[in-house]
Amino acid sequence: MLKKDLLNLYEDAKSIHFSFIGLVKRNILISTLILIVYLSIFFVDPIVRDWFSKIHNNFFDFVFNIGHWYGKPYLTFTSFLLLYIGGILFSNNRIRESGWKIFEAFVLSGIIVTVIKSILGRWRPYTEHGNFAFYFLTFGPNDHLSLPSGDVAIAFAFSTVVAGFFDNKAWKIFWFSMAVLTALGRIYHDQHWLTDVILAAVISTCVGNVVNNNSRVNSELT
């Protein structure tokens, strides 16, 4: 059982790699335009940071602290363990696979985000180095591991997978709203630039969708 799940993790990792390369090759012009638009948002980063710095109050502190908690791995690991172990104990493959999808999305998006963080070494906004300051090829300290956001990656990976559990619009809106709250909170707490959270959200949403789709295909084949 665990061997099969680990094999699925490996296959999903390959699927993400080839899907990305294939998508870029088939849509070179669109991919280039998206990259240009994304890079242009870097010029907006200081404006967004300044705006968030002016809205601090007790209400927003409370709201964005919820997002701060949601972006930590506690909920992800708790959900994974409860569903995965519960599925095994009650011989329910659907529940077990649901837990494993949460774990997969967390691991795969985490690897991608960590690699990019270490390559780029972007300084966090609170360090006051500016939005175009990078310290390439680094493993730390945390002050220059800003792009992409790890917390936002965790939040969107979890939300994408969990939102796929049920085909219900309200259910999906709730979970993605929580992820967006995490993203906004990271800017509010001056931990990340807007471009940091955008890239993390895109990466984890794509990873989560690949995990969901591959799981659905595997279920149909079995």
Predicted regions and their residues:
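Membrane-embedded catalytic cores of phosphoryl/pyrophosphoryl-handling enzymes
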Residues: 130-222
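Hydrophobic alpha-helical transmembrane segments
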Residues: 71-87, 151-154
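N-terminal transmembrane-helix/juxtamembrane module of multi-pass inner/ER membrane proteins
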Residues: 1-80, 118-138
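Structural signal for the C-terminal ends of transmembrane alpha-helices
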Residues: 14, 85-93, 165-167, 210-215
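Membrane-helix interface segments
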Residues: 58-60, 93-95, 168-173
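Hydrophobic alpha-helical transmembrane segments of integral membrane proteins
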Residues: 103-124, 185-200, 204
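Interfacial segments of alpha-helical transmembrane regions
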Residues: 26-31, 86-114
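Aromatic-anchored segments of alpha-helical transmembrane domains
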Residues: 37-43, 109-111, 179-187
